[in-house]
Amino acid sequence: MRTASPDTPAPRAPGVFALPFRVYYEDTDAGGIVYHANYLRWMERVRTEWLRTLGVQQTDLAAQQGLQFVVSELDIRYVKPARLDDLLTVDLTVDQVRGASLRLGQRVWQTSPLTQDRVDASARPLVEASVRVAVMNRQDGRPAALPRWLLNAMESS
């Protein structure tokens, strides 16, 4: 699945970062629905693009500060399948900030191809996830504090 426009985030509301995606044949399983692991790939892309909007290039963070983000916990619920050619929006909210980690809420919604709004505004998301992302020191693999400048960027976004 490719983003409809990877450089154009589509925020839904204050505090929500979102990107559009379309389901391609390569994203589906033999039953014609999105293969479960593909939702995780799309969520990772949204986290990466969200960090970019905060001024974080993960390669620079690793090279210059020796830090990297790792998923340390994941709780996911598959509510309803997405299918070939569906237009989706994957969003992200920051639910909790701790010294060395973030808990992010991520959801996948079916959206209208005409307006990119949800097909059914009252519907539950197709997929709901809670993702704990920890900051890790690349040299020793131990947890590291979230950099102050990153906390400031999150607060002002």
Placement of each model-derived feature along the sequence:
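HotDog/MaoC-like acyl-thioester-processing domains
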Residues: R2-P11, L19, Y78-L87, D95-S157
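Hot-dog-fold acyl-thioester-processing enzymes
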Residues: R2-V71, N137-S157
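Short coil/loop residues immediately preceding or within conserved phosphate-binding loops
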Residues: V71-E73, R103
